[in-house]
Amino acid sequence: MTSKESICWYLANILLVTCIGYYSYKTPFTKVEESFAMQAIHDIQTYRWDLSKYDHLEFPGAVKRSFIPSLFIAVLSYIPSWFVNPLLAARWTIGYLSWESMNSVSCSISKRFGTLSGALFILFSCAQFHLVYYMSRPLSNIFGLIATNHSLSLLLKNNYYGSISILVFAAAIVRSEIALLLMCLILPLLLQRRITLSKLLLVGISSSLAAVGASFLIDSYFWGAWCWPELEAFLFNVVEGKSSDWGTSPFYYYFVRLPWLFLNPTTLLFLLISFVYIKPARLLIYVPLFFIFVYSFLGHKEWRFIIYSIPWFNAASAIGASLCFNASKFGKKIFEILRLMFFSGIIFGFIGSSFLLYVFQYAYPGGLALTRLYEIENHPQVSVHMDVYPCMTGITRFSQLPSWYYDKTEDPKMLSNSLFISQFDYLITEDPESYNDTFDVIESVNSNTKIPILPKWLSNHIPREISIRNPAQPVYILANKKARATKPAAVDDYSSFIGHKVDEIKLWPPIYRVVSPDTLLTRDYREDRLNFFIDKDRILTHITQG
């Protein structure tokens, strides 16, 4: 290890952890596929043993997921959450664990193929937006990525059984498709006689029993019933084929998608160089390729399902790229061209990443709308109903204030009941026209269907607008039309209206709701709220507080 290579390695790692932290800071909100883990982390930190208040009991999702990764993150991020935003604390904790796993791979590459190869592995990864962007996100695939990275690190150290054991744990607890990656690794190791079948069975069975036992005990406690979540998810998505309900893609989808995920046009070139000139690196190429090939037979495809393969390819590319810094391996002219191509590819990747980060900030209108509502309304006790789409695009329990009441009712019949919906002070919805009778639009997020590419100071000097389509729907903040008093009210202030139609009330208390015989009430108790009970003719019968 030369001093220059060592400095390069340290700087590359600092750059990677900085990118992960900055990306999560610029886009702190999460989407629906991340909601289970995010809500679980919040509930474990907030409610601890009081499972009755956990979000998954009301919104369990299509399939069960393991609580083990969320429990781990909740414990690690608990103390940091005292000093920074709890949402960011959780995101940064996941990001740190992801970086540490990448650093582990880099160290193993450095010991086997040279420090420069380890540094180039990190550089390749830094310039790949999708990999870095998702490394701090509470996705089960990212928890799986952390595990598969550590497995890859042990593989590079020739610790084959340790590598296999980690993959078994990850497949049993986090993501079942990792079992396919495990099979794709075991086959060449057996054929090359790097492992024996007897010891493989011993390690595999013991690891499986430990992993399944841990998941069965811990997850059964949180779910309130005996279960092995990842087995249920596998049966639901693969055996029953229910994953296709979320859409299907052609067989070649992943292979077309890979160059876009690399974001660096030279990655494939250095993969080829590595395959041709460095025999030990070939395992890093055909194992993930075979994994992607077999996985492509499943109709429902999302790029995050194959994210585990990206570090394998990056490792092989980095080993191949390190040859371009070795003048004795190639002619001088070829050496200069390859080195120029390497740096050009890295620069291109960073430019593309900067652009994509800017665009992705528009992908969370729900979270942005709730943040904007906090800027508009500073009353300590407010009730908000949030429709499905805003909750899918950034709203989590981490975003909620303890003194506010939040409702996520999805039943169309209840939402169409004017008395039910009128009990809320504000609505956050993508469909404001459904509530025109009782609410006014006061703010919108993502109302512009286009995302401007150029900054304002530059676009003012260009006659033609340069923009791209905004894929996210607009979200609106609606305020209740009824006028309200600014000070808390008591029952006696409105007792004179008893026996009269409730519509005669012109100035309503700050916190209230109207209750008809068929009204389904929210279950919260609020000390300052007045409840106006009416009969079928809208005559006020009595008033209560709370």
Swiss-Prot record:
Subcellular localization(s) per the UniProt record: Endoplasmic reticulum membrane
Main location (coarse class): endoplasmic reticulum
Membrane association type: Multi-pass membrane protein
Bilayer-spanning residue ranges: 5-25, 67-87, 113-133, 166-186, 200-220, 258-278, 283-303, 305-325, 340-360
Superkingdom as given in the UniProt entry: Eukaryota
Pathway assigned in UniProt: Protein modification; protein glycosylation
Recorded GO MF terms: alpha-1,6-mannosyltransferase activity; dolichyl-P-Man:Man(7)GlcNAc(2)-PP-dolichol alpha-1,6-mannosyltransferase
One Gene Ontology cellular component annotation held by this UniProt entry: lumenal side of endoplasmic reticulum membrane
InterPro entries: GPI_mannosylTrfase
Catalytic activity: an alpha-D-Man-(1->2)-alpha-D-Man-(1->2)-alpha-D-Man-(1->3)-[alpha-D-Man-(1->2)-alpha-D-Man-(1->3)-alpha-D-Man-(1->6)]-beta-D-Man-(1->4)-beta-D-GlcNAc-(1->4)-alpha-D-GlcNAc-diphospho-di-trans,poly-cis-dolichol + a di-trans,poly-cis-dolichyl beta-D-mannosyl phosphate = an alpha-D-Man-(1->2)-alpha-D-Man-(1->2)-alpha-D-Man-(1->3)-[alpha-D-Man-(1->2)-alpha-D-Man-(1->3)-[alpha-D-Man-(1->6)]-alpha-D-Man-(1->6)]-beta-D-Man-(1->4)-beta-D-GlcNAc-(1->4)-alpha-D-GlcNAc-diphospho-di-trans,poly-cis-dolichol + a di-trans,poly-cis-dolichyl phosphate + H(+)
Record keywords, A-Z: Endoplasmic reticulum, Glycosyltransferase, Membrane, Transferase, Transmembrane, Transmembrane helix
Enzyme Commission identifier(s): 2.4.1.260
GO biological process: dolichol-linked oligosaccharide biosynthetic process; protein glycosylation; protein N-linked glycosylation
Free-text function comment from the UniProt entry: Mannosyltransferase that operates in the biosynthetic pathway of dolichol-linked oligosaccharides, the glycan precursors employed in protein asparagine (N)-glycosylation. The assembly of dolichol-linked oligosaccharides begins on the cytosolic side of the endoplasmic reticulum membrane and finishes in its lumen. The sequential addition of sugars to dolichol pyrophosphate produces dolichol-linked oligosaccharides containing fourteen sugars, including two GlcNAcs, nine mannoses and three glucoses.
PANTHER family tied to this protein: DOL-P-MAN:MAN(7)GLCNAC(2)-PP-DOL ALPHA-1,6-MANNOSYLTRANSFERASE, GLYCOSYLTRANSFERASE
Protein family according to the UniProt entry: Belongs to the glycosyltransferase 22 family.
Protein name: Probable Dol-P-Man:Man(7)GlcNAc(2)-PP-Dol alpha-1,6-mannosyltransferase
